[in-house]
Amino acid sequence: MFKIFKRLTAKELSMIVLAVIFVCLNVYLNLKIPDYMSDITTLLSTKGTKASDIFAWNTDAPGMRMLLMSFAGFMASVVVGFLAARTAASFTTRLRDDIFHQVLDFSDAEIKQFSIPSLLTRTTNDITQLQMVLTMGLQVITQGPIMAIWAITKIADKNGNWLLALLVAVAVIAILMLFLLIMVMPKQRLIQTLTDKLNSVTRESLTGIRVVRAYNAESYQEDKFEKANTDLTQNNLFIGRSFALLTPVMTAVSSGLTLAIYWIGAHLIEDVKIPTDPTKIAGAMEDKVHLFSDMVVYSSYAMQVVMGFMMMIVVFFLLPRAVVAAGRINEVLDTQSSVSYPENSSEKPKDVGTVEFDDVSFRYSETSEPVLEHVSFKAKKGDTVAFIGSTGSGKSTLVNLIPRFYDATQGTIKVDGVDVRHYDHETLHNIVGYIPQKAVLFSGNITSNMTMGTSNNSPLDDAKIWEALELAQGKDFVENKEGQLKAEVAQAGSNFSGGQKQRLAIARALARKPEILIFDDSFSALDYKTDRKLRQELSEKTQDMTKLIVAQRISTIMDADQILVLDQGKVVGQGTHKELLANNEVYQEVAYSQLSKEELENGK
C-alpha cells in the first residue's frame, strides 16, 4: 500500500501536507465551538443578560465568535476537499498512464499471465479504489483520529464519572471496529478477484455471442454468469449487512453516551446543596450553573470523540479494498517484460532483407513442453518462405519470434544479419511488417488505421494509401464507402466483413514498405479469387521485399521459393513445392487432402 504512494510527486506531497494542516485547523476550530457554547450557557443562566451580550456585530460576543469559528471551519473543510480531490485526481491520472505504458511494453507472455479482463479491472476499478481512499483519507480518515485524540485531551481533566462513561462508549466502538476487522476484511479482499471473474465471463460471452447463439448455449453462458454474479453479490451482501450494523450501533452509542452524561450531570448538580445562609446561596447557584455549562460542553466534546471514531471506521470500509488494489497495481508496475529492447540498435544491418533462424527452440515457460525445436533456415532478400503444418505445429509461434512478441529460449534469430535482440524497438518494427491471423482495426477512420505507427519523417499521403489498398485488393470496396478514406471504422472494425478487415490490415503493412513482410495466416478470410490475385500482385510488385507466409491452404504457398513443413514444433520437411510433393509424406498428406494431382503438379 505504502509502496505505491512512493510514486507521489513533490507537488502532490506538498498538497497532502497542506491538506493535513487545514484538517488540523478545522479540528481546532470545531473544538473551539463548545467553549463558546459554555460561555453562552453561562450568560443565559445569569440574570440581566441581554441578547446583545450573546450575539452582536463584534468579536467580543460569544455568539459572533461561534459563528466566525463555524464559517472558518467550513472554509477549511472546503480547502481540504479541494486539495484532496486535486491530489487524488493528479496521482491516479499519472498512475493510469504508467500502467497503460507498462502494459504496452509487455510481451504476449505477460499479457497471458495477467489476462486482459484482469488488466482492465486493474486499470479502472482498482485505480478508482485508490482515488477514493486518497480523497476520503485526507478528508475523513486523517480527521477522525486527530479529532478523537484532541477532544479526549480537552476533557480528560473533567469529572471522572463523565470520563468513565466516555471510555465505555469508546470500548463499544472498539469492539465494533474489531468485529469489522476480523469478519469483513477477508471478504473485502475477495472483491477484486470476483470482479475479475465476472468481467472475464461477461467479455467471453459478448465476444463470442454469435457462437453462443449458434449452439443454443445461452443457458450455459447464463449459468456461468449467474454463478460469477451470485458469488460477487453474496460477498457484497455480507459486507453491506455487516456495515449496516454501523449506523444503528453508533446511533445507540451516541444517544446512550449523551443520556449518561446528562444523567451523571443531573446527579452532580443535585449534589450541590443550597445552603441556609443567604449570603452563600449565590455561590451555590453559580456552582450549579458551572456544572450545567460543563455538562453541555462535555456532551459536545464526547460527540466529537464519537464522530472521530465513526470517521476511523470508514478506514475499515475503504482500506482493505485499497490495499488489495494497490497490491494488484504494484504487481503490474513491478512486472518487467520478458522481452527487453536496447535504447539504440547496437549493430548496423549487414545483409539487408534476410531472415535467419539458427537452431532456434522455444517454450512458453521453463516447465512447459517445447513448442519449437531446433529450427534452422535462411530467407534471402526478395524470397517467399512459407510455413505449413497441422494445427498446433508451431507455425504462428515461429513467425511471432521475429518481431519479438516472444524471445527464443535457445538459438539465434537474425534480421538483416543482426540478432533481433540487438535492435531497438522502433528500428526492428520499421524493418518488419506484420499482419496477424485475426485482423485488428481500431476505431477512427480508414486513414487513421492506415497511417498507424508512421512518423513525421515518413508520412503517408493519400496517394500512398490508395497504392497500398490497390495492391491489397481493397481499393474497390473503400471507394464504395461513404467518405472513402475518411469512412468510419467502428471499434474492432465491426462495420467491415472479415475479408475487408484482412485486406485493410494487409494494406496497412504494405503502406509502410517494410523490408520483411510476415503474413500469419492472413489470407484465410479471403475468397480464392481474391487470394490468387493478391498473391500474384505481391509477387510482381514486392520483389524487393522478403515475405514469410503462414498458411493452411496449399494453393497459397505453391509458388513459394522455400516451404518449411512443421510437425509438433519440428521441421520435418524443407524445399520447394515440387520437391516436398515428391518426397515428404506430411506435405503430401496435406496437399492431396486439398487439391487434385493435376492441380498440384501445375505448381512451382
Predicted features and spans:
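ABC-type nucleotide-binding domain
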Residues: 348-604
